[in-house]
């Protein structure tokens, strides 16, 4: 039995949802109350929720205290505790596999030149891991053994995004991707369960044509997994626990985004959806039995659980609105029994 945990606030009683087709413009309508920019800034927000390795705590980003800082809350419910206190923006929290550290990124005065920080969830000790004002580092992702952090690198004067790996034991950096192509973006590094390779997405066309690559962590040799003719988008969202398949999203074929399983050895895709809505792949469950994907339908985002063995999918019984699986590396607990989502 799988349960779901939401990061949204307590919902009001169900209300009738207006059919968008029935909405008509009224130029003569009066605005009873103006929503000011100041009030918009006062809106409380919660995001970036992610499980602790033992499933007992959820880390998340919130501006409840005025700035986007890191908070912790018991997964069974309770009062949240502010873990970091900073005037700088913080985002993308991710737990180390042993639960001793949480990696996150923070910039300086909103300049979007991000550094990677570590904070101890027990003591609150903060360490600036990269400390490079002229280089932006984003999307930190722990290796399964917790020794390495893969992340995206972009020098301030460059338009190229590359992937580096930081060795927390030796305290040195290895460049996994390099090149000279202008505007190349290597993004979303995803570790295999054995830590031997990383799957990433490369975009050289500003959103119209992209590919999925696999890079060997030791040799830094990259292999193209999605060779194709024409301009189509292929992006990776997760690697199966057995390391044999990649969950991808692509508009190949009819131009609509759909979800498929890419066989790494044969470079063949088994499509899971063939829909006219915008479908996005998300994550495998740790036991390899399920995966999640989302569907944007009539302005609502529905979250689906797909059983790999049977090929059957069903929408999770969530409130109408925008729902998506949370978690920087996985929305599932390690035992695959609980699913974290945002609403």
Which sequence ranges carry the predicted segments?
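Short flexible coil/turn linkers enriched for glycine and charged/polar residues
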Residues: 77, 110, 123, 157-158, ...
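Structural motif
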Residues: 67-71, 111-117, 158-164, 207-213, ...
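Signal peptide processing junction and immediate N-terminal pro/mature segment
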Residues: 2-15
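Conserved beta-propeller blade repeats
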Residues: 42-61, 87-106, 116, 132-155, ...
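Blade/loop signatures of beta-propeller domains
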Residues: 14-35
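A short beta-strand motif characteristic of beta-propeller blades
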Residues: 35-40, 79-84, 125-131, 172-179, ...
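Beta-propeller domains
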Residues: 60-83
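Short loop/turn segments that connect beta-strands within beta-propeller blades
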Residues: 74-78, 120-124, 167-171, 216-220, ...
């Amino acid at each position: 039995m799988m349960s779901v945990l939401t990061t949204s606030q307590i919902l009001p009683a169900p209300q009738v949802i207006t059919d968008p087709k029935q909405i008509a413009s009224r130029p003569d309508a009066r605005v009873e109350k103006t929503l000011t920019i100041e009030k918009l800034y006062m809106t409380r927000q919660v995001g970036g929720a992610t499980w602790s390795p033992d499933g007992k705590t959820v880390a998340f980003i919130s501006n409840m205290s005025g700035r986007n800082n890191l908070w912790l809350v018991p997964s069974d419910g309770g009062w949240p505790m502010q873990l970091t206190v900073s005037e700088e923006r913080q985002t993308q929290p991710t737990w180390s596999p042993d639960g001793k550290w949480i990696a996150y990124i923070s910039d300086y005065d909103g300049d979007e030149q991000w550094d990677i920080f570590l904070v101890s969830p027990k003591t609150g000790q903060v360490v600036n891991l990269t400390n490079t004002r002229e280089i932006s580092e984003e999307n930190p992702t722990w290796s399964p053994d917790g020794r390495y952090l893969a992340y995206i690198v972009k020098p301030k004067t460059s338009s190229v995004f590359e992937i580096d790996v930081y060795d927390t034991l030796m305290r040195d950096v290895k460049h996994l991707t390099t090149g000279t192509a202008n505007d190349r973006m290597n993004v979303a590094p995803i570790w295999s369960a054995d830590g031997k390779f990383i799957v990433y997405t490369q975009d050289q066309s500003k959103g119209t044509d992209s590919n999925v690559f696999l890079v060997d962590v030791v040799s830094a040799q990259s292999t193209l997994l999605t060779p194709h003719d024409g301009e189509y988008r292929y992006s990776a969202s997760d690697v199966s626990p057995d390391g044999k398949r990649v969950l991808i999203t692509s508009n190949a074929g009819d131009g609509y985004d759909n979800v498929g399983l890419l066989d790494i050895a044969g470079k063949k895709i088994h499509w899971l959806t063939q829909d006219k809505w915008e479908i996005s792949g998300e994550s495998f469950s740790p036991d390899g039995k399920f995966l999640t994907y989302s569907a944007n339908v009539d302005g609502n985002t529905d979250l689906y659980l797909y059983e790999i063995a049977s090929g059957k999918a069903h929408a999770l019984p969530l409130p109408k609105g925008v729902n998506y699986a949370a978690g920087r590396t996985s929305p599932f607990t390690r035992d695959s029994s609980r699913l974290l989502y945002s609403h």
